[in-house]
């Protein structure tokens, strides 16, 4: 199971391991939890939620220090795209995903007809999030969300999630006892946050309830609805592996920059398999491991993967897995040896980027969008290929000023 949405609150859950530097200051709020929970009850009532729902859902809730410990224990480990994709897009997961594409073909076809999201995309998320429903979590969601909303780190993020979880019960979609999921409050086959569930949940089996935990039709259709919310466009591609030349203008390899496929073709970019139409379809060049690693054209629909999970490696892996389920062969490792930076090297790099004026972000050991952007600026300053991928060579240049 991979917790995902909380990345929007500054945490890339699921792509992390213990790191004291990320844990932040201790926070002791447990003594006043009952009084705080009374405030949540009042807020929920003001939002139109009945006292019966409030009591049923929040009555059994107690502060769980184990949830806080898990949250505090989330730090960073570095995995490259090839490492993460190699682990997550395993032969077993390919086999089971392919089998589900066949056994659930009728359902997936109806969902695609309604929402425009292809079956391989939904099955890819289903596999990555809960291993096709086999690991949906065991934590009482109201206890998890109340604990995280009360904790001092991100109350403004989790408190609305708690209120939206109450809305789900109020609408009759699930009972409080059925609201069981990940320790961070996500639920169901597709691991939806309560806010996403309440906004994008779909009753696709026609029983009058939107049940993303127990109903596969509801869960998959809700996932498709959520992707549409994140900008998915019917009938458009999302990711295509390509080969890149040695003399490409690397500063154009940026998700914020799009060019027509015809322009990429003029620069020597070619499809890794099949052909690359030299047309006006816009695409960004995605280099998850720099110019010597795998290369993809990321189409506008790739933004829906980033909407689902802002963690760059996860989003790329999900999109790649969907292409594999669509029939694409395994990705090429690229053109040359790549030595990923360690977590300590990333922290040093980030500190140097701040010192040299390329960034204002506090070093945290994570290679996120801000670090990649700062790396690109530094590469351009020092005359290095500006592919946004951090290297030991760049660290040496930054050390020297």
List the model feature ranges, each with a label:
Residues 29-56:
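Mature N-terminal segment immediately following signal peptide/propeptide cleavage
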Residues 300-301:
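Low-complexity, glycine/alanine/valine/leucine- and proline-rich hydrophobic stretches
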Residues 36-43, 107, 144, 349, ...:
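A general alpha-helix detector
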Residues 339-346, 354-398:
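Short acidic, glycine/serine/threonine-rich helix-capping segments at coil-helix boundaries
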Residues 1-3:
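N-terminal secretory signal peptides that target proteins for export/translocation
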Residues 8-18:
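Bacterial N-terminal signal peptides
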Residues 19-23:
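Sec/Tat signal peptide C-region and signal peptidase I cleavage site
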């Amino acid at each position: 199971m991979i917790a995902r949405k909380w990345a929007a609150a500054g945490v890339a859950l699921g792509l992390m391991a213990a790191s004291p530097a990320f844990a932040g200051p201790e926070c002791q709020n447990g003594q006043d939890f009952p009084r705080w929970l009374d405030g949540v009850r009042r807020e929920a009532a003001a939002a139109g939620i009945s006292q019966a729902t409030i009591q049923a859902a929040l009555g059994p809730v107690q502060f769980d220090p184990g949830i806080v410990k898990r949250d505090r224990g989330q730090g960073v480990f570095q995995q490259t795209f090839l490492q993460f994709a190699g682990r997550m897009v395993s032969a077993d997961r390919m086999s089971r995903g392919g089998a589900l594409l066949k056994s659930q073909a009728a359902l997936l076809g109806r969902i695609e007809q309604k929402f425009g999201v292809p079956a391989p995309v939904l099955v890819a998320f289903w596999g990555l999030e809960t291993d096709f429903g086999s690991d949906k979590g065991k934590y009482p969601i109201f206890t998890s969300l109340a604990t995280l909303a009360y904790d001092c780190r991100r109350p403004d993020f989790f408190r609305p999630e708690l209120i939206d979880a109450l809305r789900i019960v109020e609408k009759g979609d699930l009972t409080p006892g059925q609201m069981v999921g990940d320790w961070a409050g996500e639920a169901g086959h597709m691991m939806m946050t309560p806010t996403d569930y309440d906004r994008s949940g779909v009753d696709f089996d026609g029983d009058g309830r939107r049940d993303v935990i127990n109903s596969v039709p509801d869960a998959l259709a809700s996932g498709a609805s959520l992707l549409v919310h994140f900008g998915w466009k019917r009938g458009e591609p999302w990711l295509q592996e390509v080969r890149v030349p040695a003399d490409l203008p690397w500063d154009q390899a940026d998700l914020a920059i799009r060019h027509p496929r015809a322009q990429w073709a003029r620069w020597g970019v070619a499809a890794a398999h099949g052909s690359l139409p030299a047309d006006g379809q816009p695409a960004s060049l995605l280099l998850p491991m720099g110019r010597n690693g795998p290369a993809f054209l990321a189409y506008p629909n790739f933004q829906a993967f980033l909407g689902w999970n802002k963690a760059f490696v996860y989003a790329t892996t999900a999109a790649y897995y969907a292409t594999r389920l669509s029939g694409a062969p395994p990705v090429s490792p690229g053109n040359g040896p790549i030595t990923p930076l360690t977590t300590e090297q990333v922290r040093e790099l980030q500190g140097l980027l701040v010192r040299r004026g390329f960034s204002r972000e506090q070093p945290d050991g994570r290679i996120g969008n801000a670090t990649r952007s700062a790396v690109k600026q530094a590469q351009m300053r020092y005359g290095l290929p500006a592919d946004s991928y951090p290297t030991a060579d760049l660290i040496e240049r930054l050390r020297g000023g």
